Amino acid sequence: RELPERIVIPPIKGEMVHLRRATIDDIARMEVIEAYVGASGITGKDRVAERGAVNAWVRRSVAWSNGEKSNESGVGDPESRRTIAWSIVTEADHDGDGELDAASSDNVIGMIFLIDIDGWARSARIQVVLGKDYRGRGYSRDIMPRVMTYGFAPEPAGLGMHRIWVAVPEQNTRSVSVYQ
């Protein structure tokens, strides 16, 4: 089964946040929200590796949504599979100061990815990366089921996946409880 040459990444609305297609500009916003602080305890990668992975995932997602083949986009790797990247956006003012909580990052508080999308096996891996001040607030619990619903939904509404899996280091008990 072949994946489409071009993907239209749908916006997804959650109760607390909404998701929009990630852009190249959002890569810099991940630095502003300190998304890579403590990465080794969360994903098992150090800051440099996590930053590199997010950069590659966003670029692959943008390339796919533009209809570029991996060898045309400059981000290709013959062994890499397709990726979809969403930016997680909030419009919350939790402290009641009249300013949006994430105004310094254009309201981006993290990203969620479907990576290693395999059309033949109909499987993908899901990964969430949140800014350090946005962890443990229930955002992952809000958005993960919605992204998985899109992944499992039959085409054309979704990707028609049969399996979506997650890789979490054993010591990250907080994330393990969300993913279960």
Residues covered by each model-derived region:
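Alpha-helix N-capping/helix-start residues
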Residues: 24, 51, 141, 170-173
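Conserved acetyl-CoA pyrophosphate-binding loop and the N-cap/start of the following alpha-helix
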Residues: 134, 138-147
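Conserved active-site tyrosine of GNAT-family acetyltransferases
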Residues: 179-180
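Conserved GNAT acetyl-CoA-binding A-motif
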Residues: 123, 154-167
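Conserved beta-strand-loop-alpha-helix junction that forms the acyl-donor binding cleft
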Residues: 131-135, 150, 162-176
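Amphipathic alpha-helical recognition patches that constitute DNA-binding helices
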Residues: 29, 125, 129, 142, ...
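GNAT-family acyltransferases
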Residues: 1-133
